[in-house]
Amino acid sequence: MDKENYIAKYSLEEVSWDGSLRSANYLSSSSGSTGSPFFWPRSARQDVIVGHMLQPLFERMFDTKKTTTFFCDSFALGTWIAGLLYYNATKWIADQGNAILVASPGIDKEETIREIRRFSSSFDQVILAGYPPFIKDVISFGKEAGVKWEDMNIRLLLGGESISEPWRKNLLSLLGGPQSLARIISVYGMAETGFIAHETPLSIALKQELSASSADIFPQQEKIAGFYQYYPATRYFEVVEEDSLLLTADAGIPLIRYYTRDSGGIADYAAVMRQKKTLAGLPAAEVGNWQMPFLYLYGRKDLSVSFYALKMYVGNVKSALEQSPFYSQLSGLFTMRVEQTANFDQRLEFTIELSRGQEPSEHMTHIVAEFLHHKLQETSSEYTKLCTAIGERATPHVTLVPYGTITTVPGKKHKWVAAST
C-alpha cells in the first residue's frame, strides 16, 4: 500500500482506526516535500511509543538521568508533526526521572538563540533539535551574534533528512569543542508515523568506516546517505524489489506493508558485527552496546530530475557540494531543475545559495560549476558517458544567489527539486 492507493483513495475517517477519528487526540500534517500536504491523526498513545523509543537515546547517549538538560525544540510547530512530536515525547521522557526542561521556540533563529543564551548556563548540557539546514543556520547566526558554542556542552538532534559525514564534520568544526560521535545525532521519521529510527555511536562509526572501506558489505554502499538503528517491535521493515522499503507500524492510521518511497535496506545486528573485522578502527569506547537491527537509506526515489533520461539525484549533488573546498561559502541550500533551451535541448540548472555575507561573482560561479561537473562524473558513469556524447551541453548551469534568496516555508522541508518554467 502507498499514499495513492490507500491514503488518498479513501476519506480520512475510513482509513483511521475503527473508521472514526474518535481515538485521535490531534492532527499533524505532512511537509509536502513530494506532493500536497496531508493530515494525519495522532493519539497520545503514539507519542508515548515514540517516547519509549527515544528514551534509550536520551539516557544512554545524552546521559539525561545524571545530566541536567535544556532541550530546545526548534522543529516547526503548528500542525507539522516534528515540533509537537518531539515536544510531547521529550516531556514524557522527562517524567521518567530525567532532568530535562523543554522549550519550543520553533523555526525562529532569534528566539532560539535568545532561549539558549538565557537558559544554557543553568543546565549541564543543551540539546538543540531541528531540521539540519535550519540548525546549521542557527549555529552560524549564533557565532556572528557572539555565542561561544565551543564553551557550551551542546548536542544536536537533527531530523527531516539524512546528513553526510562531510556535513557532520563541517558542523562540528563550526561548534568547536569535543568531536564526539554522540554530539550530532540524526533521526529518521515520516509524517505518517513520526519517529522511526536514530543514529547511534555504533551506526555513525560504521557509516564513517564504510565510506572509507573498499569492502563490499552492503549493496550499493557508496550510495548510503543515512545509516540508523531501529526498534523492530514498533517499526517493522521489509525490503522488496531490491531496495524499496515497506513499513508496518502502529500509527494514527494503520500502516501495513506501507511503501515509504525511500530506497535502502535493512541488516541484522549480528550479521553486521560479523563483518566488523573488515571495518578496522571502530572506537569501542563510544559504540556501546546497541544490539538492534540497522536501517540504511539511499534517499527518496522521487528526489531527482531526469536529464537526457538519466536520473540526477539531490543526494549526489548535496554530497558533492559538502565535499567542496568552498562549502563554508555556501548556505547549504540549492534547487535543481531541467529546463528546455530555445533550441529544445535540455539544460541541467542549479540555483545555489551563498552563506551570509558572500556575494555572487562570475569567478565563483565558474568554480562551482566546474567542481559540480567534475564531481557528478565521479558519482555517475552514465553521466560521464553523457558528457562524452553531448559535450558542453551536459555541463551544469549554475546561478549563485545571496543568502536568504532561497526561502524555506516554516514546517515544510526544503524543495530541492524546482519545477521547470
How would you describe each model-predicted region?
Residues 111, 142-147, 158, 232-240, ...:
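AMP-binding adenylation
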Residues 1-69, 73, 118, 122, ...:
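Nucleotide 5′-phosphate-binding alpha/beta core
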Residues 43-57, 70-136:
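AMP-binding/adenylate-forming
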Residues 107-114, 124-170, 174, 183-192:
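Adenylate-forming
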Residues 60-67, 93-96, 121-125, 144-152, ...:
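Secondary-structure boundary elements
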